[in-house]
A protein has these predicted regions:
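Long C-terminal subdomains/extensions of small-metabolite kinases
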Residues: 1-110
Length: 110
């Protein structure tokens, strides 16, 4: 949850659950072999060390992704969906979490 996904990948370590923005990572169209060589740095959050122009990180309240042709396959919490466009919108504090007193939602889980 938060800034981690996929078994501990943290591509944008500065992301926080409470910062009010979606942190998006756009990986330029690279081959699977090329991405495999970059994945360690990407997963560790060292995107600033990657070659210029391969990855773009930005923040937004709304992200809309449209397929140039065909459908996109989107996976959300293990469920796959197919559509021509996907819109992600940040909901402002719509979920309440209960945690032990003094627990910081932005603290590192590691």
């Amino acid at each position: 949850t938060g800034r981690y996904y996929g078994g501990g990948s943290t591509p944008v370590p500065e992301a926080r659950m409470t910062d009010g923005v979606l942190h998006t990572v756009l990986v330029k169209n690279v081959s699977k072999a090329r991405f495999a060589t970059l994945f360690g740095s990407y997963s560790a959050g060292d995107y600033k060390k990657l070659p210029q122009g391969i990855i773009r990180v930005s923040t937004a309240k709304v992200v809309r992704i449209e397929a140039l042709e065909g459908d996109l396959t989107t996976c959300l919490d293990g469920e796959s969906m197919h559509s021509q466009c996907v819109t992600l919108k940040l909901a402002d504090k719509k979920v309440n979490f209960f945690a032990p007193k003094g627990c910081d939602p932005d603290a590192t889980a590691r």
